[in-house]
C-alpha cells in the first residue's frame, strides 16, 4: 500500500469496490419507471399516477444533474485560475517595485513601513478575492443541487396530500358519511396498494436526493438531503400506520 492509498483509502481507483457501497442511478430510475407502470395499470385515472409520471421526469433530470455536478465545471475553473494568477502577479509586481525603489535612510524606512502596510492590505484583499474565485464553482453546484432538491421536496408534499384523505378506519368501523366527507371508492385491498405506492414514491424520492449527497461534496447540500430524508421517513411512517390499521382490522 502506497502513502496516498493509506491516506485516501476511499479516493479514486476504488471503482471495483463500489458495487454495493455506492448508489447507482440506473436501478433507481428503472424502479421508478416500473412503479409508474404499476400505478397506471392499477389506478389509471388517479391523480397519483400523474404525480408518479411527473416524478419520473423529475428523477431523470435530477439524476443527470447529479451526474454532471460530479464533474468539474472547466470554464468556471479556468477563469477562476486565470483571475487568481492575475491577482498574484499584480501583488508580486507591487513587491518588486517596492524593493526596487527602497533606499536606506530615515525617509526610506518610513516609506518602507507605509508600503509594507499597503502590501499587507493587498495580501488580505488578494486572499479574499482568491477564496471567492475558488468557491464560485462550488457555489454554482450548490445552487443547482438545492433547486433540484426543492422540487423533490415538493413531490413529497404532493404525495402526502394524495394519501391524506385515504382513511383506513372506513374499513374497520362503520362511519356515517357527511355531505363534506371525501368520496372513497377504494376497497380494502386497493387502499392498501394505493398507500403502498405512496410509500414507494417517497422512498425513491429520498434515493434520488441521496445522489446529490453522493456526488456533491458540500455541507449545505448534505444538510438539505438529510432534511428531505427525514421528511420522507416521517411521511412514510404516517402511511404505514394506516396500512397497519387495515391489517389489524382484517
Residue ranges of predicted features:
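Solvent-exposed, non-transmembrane helices and loops of integral membrane proteins
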Residues: 45, 143-188
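Alpha-helical transmembrane segments and their immediate juxtamembrane boundary regions
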Residues: 64-140
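Short, charged cytosolic
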Residues: 19-26, 35-63
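Short, charged/polar, low-complexity loop and linker segments
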Residues: 34-39, 107, 127-136, 178-186, ...
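Amphipathic alpha-helix face/heptad-repeat signature
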Residues: 24, 28, 51, 119, ...
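Sequence termini and other peripheral, non-core segments
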Residues: 1-29, 33, 42, 78
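Cytosol-/stroma-facing membrane-proximal "stalk/adaptor" domains immediately downstream
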Residues: 207-250
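Mature extracytoplasmic or organellar-lumen-exposed domains after removal of signal/transit peptides
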Residues: 49-67, 83, 94-95, 193-209, ...
Amino acid at each position: 500500500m502506497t502513502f496516498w492509498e493509506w491516506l485516501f483509502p476511499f479516493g479514486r481507483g476504488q471503482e471495483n469496490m463500489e458495487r454495493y457501497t455506492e448508489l447507482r442511478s440506473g436501478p433507481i430510475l428503472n424502479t421508478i419507471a416500473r412503479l409508474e407502470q404499476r400505478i397506471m395499470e392499477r389506478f389509471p385515472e388517479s391523480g397519483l399516477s400523474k404525480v408518479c409520471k411527473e416524478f419520473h421526469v423529475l428523477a431523470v433530470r435530477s439524476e443527470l444533474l447529479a451526474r454532471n455536478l460530479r464533474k468539474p465545471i472547466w470554464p468556471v475553473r479556468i477563469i477562476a485560475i486565470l483571475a487568481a494568477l492575475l491577482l498574484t502577479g499584480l501583488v508580486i509586481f507591487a513587491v518588486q517595485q517596492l524593493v526596487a525603489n527602497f533606499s536606506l535612510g530615515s525617509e526610506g524606512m518610513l516609506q518602507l513601513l507605509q508600503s509594507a502596510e499597503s502590501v499587507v492590505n493587498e495580501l488580505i484583499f488578494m486572499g479574499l478575492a482568491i477564496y471567492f474565485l475558488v468557491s464560485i464553482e462550488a457555489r454554482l453546484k450548490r445552487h443547482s443541487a438545492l433547486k433540484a432538491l426543492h422540487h423533490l421536496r415538493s413531490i413529497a408534499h404532493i404525495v402526502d396530500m394524495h394519501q391524506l384523505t385515504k382513511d383506513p378506519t372506513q374499513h374497520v368501523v362503520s362511519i356515517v358519511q357527511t355531505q363534506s366527507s371525501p368520496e372513497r371508492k377504494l376497497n380494502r385491498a386497493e387502499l392498501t396498494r394505493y398507500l403502498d405506492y405512496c410509500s414507494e414514491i417517497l422512498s425513491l424520492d429520498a434515493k434520488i436526493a441521496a445522489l446529490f449527497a453522493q456526488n456533491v461534496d458540500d455541507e449545505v447540500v448534505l444538510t438539505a438531503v438529510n432534511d428531505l430524508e427525514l421528511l420522507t421517513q416521517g411521511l412514510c411512517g404516517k402511511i404505514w400506520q394506516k396500512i397497519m390499521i387495515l391489517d389489524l382490522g382484517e
